[in-house]
Structure formats: structure tokens, C-alpha cells
């Protein structure tokens, strides 16, 4: 299943393109369109694949062993970046934009400006790994879910369906559960956690859980696996027409049914369209990433380093570029290849040769001599 690993690496690596517009502060329509489009599928696709590989490893070595492995692979880099690199990144970002270079200003103002920098919370992009870690710890619960009779009955029911009907059922179910997760978060946690970075992690954990569970089904059901590697042009077009209608009539929908219900409709439409994009990505990668050549293998292996370091590198590169130009669009365009190059070099020449750095930045076990 090397194409799934390549697809996972791809969705991790395109974070450079998305976050470059944020760190550069560019508001051009083109990068905003790329960001909007990618948000429809990127996170859910990664979590589906994550659920698949969790189930695959659990079947091989047991859920307890794979949980310990994922705690190391996710937990160690999370702690390193939350405690070291994210504070440095936030300081540089704030210093560049607001001209507050005094370190003590941020060191002694927590949880004030230090924790909220230009729309990015203290976790920055690491929120996603935190959510995956939560799923990892709860993996035994997810695997228990697929062993109970009602769930197995549903899977058995899907096994008898044609691919096009399976796609409709999965698209509606996951999109509906995503919207329900947002509603539950609003009702149960919004008043407790308030608005902020931690609140966002709680929200993401609730809303993306159905896609992680889908990844487990993706592994356990050959029929579902096959269906999600097919492309229904008609259903895809319908999903995009529905999304366009919701986006273009958002204000009138909100006026008619109220803000909260209209938000549920919007999220449902976005996840519904995003589901079919995920299927297209599975279809394309399964057919065109046929062999695991050296380039694909290297990019897959380095994607974790790229994902972890890219915002730190982008902020540093932007600082350098802004000394030559004030045009944010130029900074955005130039910073992307520079950030990729620096991150790949970090992985090749610094992280990979060192067992300790491979543990700290990739969560790999220390190699014995």
C-alpha cells in the first residue's frame, strides 16, 4: 500500500503551500482559493489514512503495541515542538509583524499575546498531531467498536451494496456526523473551554472522529475499500452544486433557519463535497503511484520532518525575504520552494543521520549499535 503512504506524505507536505500564505500575510485570491479547496479534503483524507494504518498495524502487532508505538512517534515530536520550536516561531512571527522584540514581553504574558499570534494559537499546526494522538490512545475503543454486532451488521449491509450506493451512504453519514460533532462541541464544551487554541483541539477531536473510524472500516472491509477507490462523476458534480448553492446563499439560509442550523448545513455541504474529493485522490494515487521508487520513498520518509518544521522555517524565511521586499505576494511565492528545500535538507543532513534527532523530530526508536 505504498501509494497510501505517498498520498499521506502529499497531504502533509502541501501544508507548506497553505501556511505560506498565513505566515506571509498575503490576501491574494489565488492562495486563498487553494487554501479553501484544500480544507475540503486534506485533514479528513489524512485521518482516514491514519485510521487505516492504525488498524493495519493493530492487526499485525496488537492494539496495545501499536498504541505505544504511536505515542512515541506522535508524542515526542509534539512535546519538542510545543515546548521549544513553537514558542520560538511565535516570538519571531510577533516580533516581525508587531515589532515587539523583547523576549520577556512574551515570556511573562501567558496566556495572552504569546498564545495567540495572528490567528494561530500556541499549538500552531501541531494541533493535528495532538488530535491523532488522542485517537491513538483511544484506539482500543475504536477497534472495540468494530467488534460489536450492530456495527458489524452495518458493515455486512454495506458489503451487499453496489459501489455507488456505498459512496452515498458513507458521504451522508460522515458529513452528518461531522455536523453533529460541531453541534455537540457547541452545546457541551463551548462554554467550558471558551474560544481559543485548546477549544479548537477539542472541536477537531470531536468532528474528525468519524473519519478515523471510517479509516478502520476502510481497512476491514474490502468492499468499502473498493468503493472509495472508485469515482462517481454524477455524485461528485451533485456534491459540488450543493456546496456552491450553500456557499452562495449562506446569508439567506442563516436568516431563514437561524445561525446554528445554517452552520450545520454549511459544514455538511463542505464535508459532503470533500468526501468525493478524497475518493478521487484514492483513485488517482492507486493508479499512478504504481511503484515505490527512490524519489517517492524519500519524499514519503521526509514528509514528517517537512510537516513539523515548515512553519518555523517559513517564518524565518519570510523574515529574511521581507528585508528585500514588502510585497507579500512575492514573499509568499518565493518562500514556498525555499521552505521545501530547507526542510528536505534538514531531514537529509541533520535529522536522519542522528538517532537522537530522529527520535525527537520523527518519533523513531533509538537504534542500537
Where do the protein language model's features map onto the residues?
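Alpha-helical transmembrane segments and their immediate juxtamembrane cytosolic regions
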Residues: 1-369
Amino acid at each position: 500500500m505504498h501509494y497510501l503512504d505517498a498520498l499521506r506524505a502529499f497531504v502533509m507536505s502541501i501544508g507548506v503551500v497553505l501556511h505560506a500564505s498565513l505566515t506571509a500575510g498575503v490576501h491574494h485570491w489565488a492562495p486563498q482559493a487553494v487554501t479553501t479547496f484544500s480544507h475540503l479534503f486534506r485533514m479528513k483524507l489524512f485521518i482516514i489514512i491514519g485510521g487505516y494504518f492504525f488498524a493495519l498495524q493493530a492487526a499485525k502487532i496488537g492494539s496495545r503495541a501499536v498504541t505505544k508505538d504511536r505515542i512515541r512517534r506522535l508524542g515526542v515530536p509534539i512535546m519538542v515542538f510545543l515546548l521549544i520550536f513553537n514558542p520560538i516561531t511565535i516570538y519571531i512571527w510577533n516580533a516581525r509583524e508587531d515589532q515587539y522584540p523583547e523576549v520577556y514581553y512574551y515570556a511573562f504574558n501567558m496566556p495572552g499575546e504569546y498564545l495567540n499570534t495572528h490567528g494561530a494559537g500556541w499549538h500552531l499546526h501541531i494541533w493535528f498531531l495532538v488530535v491523532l494522538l488522542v485517537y491513538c490512545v483511544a484506539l482500543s475503543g475504536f477497534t472495540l467498536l468494530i467488534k460489536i454486532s450492530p456495527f458489524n451488521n452495518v458493515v455486512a449491509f454495506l458489503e451487499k451494496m453496489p459501489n455507488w450506493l456505498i459512496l452515498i451512504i458513507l458521504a451522508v453519514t460522515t458529513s452528518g456526523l461531522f455536523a453533529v460533532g460541531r453541534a455537540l462541541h457547541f452545546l457541551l464544551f463551548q462554554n467550558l473551554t471558551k474560544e481559543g487554541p485548546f477549544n479548537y483541539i477539542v472541536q477537531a477531536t470531536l468532528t474528525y472522529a468519524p473519519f478515523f473510524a471510517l479509516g478502520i472500516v476502510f481497512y476491514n472491509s474490502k468492499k468499502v475499500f473498493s468503493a472509495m477507490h472508485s469515482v462517481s462523476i454524477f455524485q461528485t458534480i451533485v456534491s459540488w452544486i450543493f456546496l456552491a448553492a450553500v456557499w452562495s446563499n449562506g446569508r439567506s439560509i442563516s436568516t431563514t433557519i437561524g445561525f446554528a442550523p445554517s452552520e450545520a448545513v454549511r459544514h455538511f455541504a463542505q464535508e459532503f463535497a470533500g468526501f468525493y474529493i478524497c475518493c478521487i485522490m484514492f483513485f488517482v494515487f492507486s493508479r499512478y503511484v504504481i511503484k515505490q521508487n527512490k524519489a517517492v520513498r524519500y519524499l514519503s520518509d521526509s514528509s514528517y520532518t517537512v510537516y513539523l518544521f515548515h512553519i518555523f522555517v517559513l517564518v524565518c524565511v519570510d523574515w529574511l525575504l521581507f528585508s528585500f521586499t514588502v510585497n507579500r505576494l512575492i514573499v509568499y511565492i518565493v518562500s514556498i520552494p525555499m521552505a521545501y528545500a530547507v526542510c528536505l535538507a534538514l531531514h537529509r543532513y541533520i535529522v536522519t543521520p542522528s538517532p537522537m534527532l530522529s527520535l525527537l523530530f520523527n518519533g523513531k526508536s533509538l537504534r542500537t549499535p
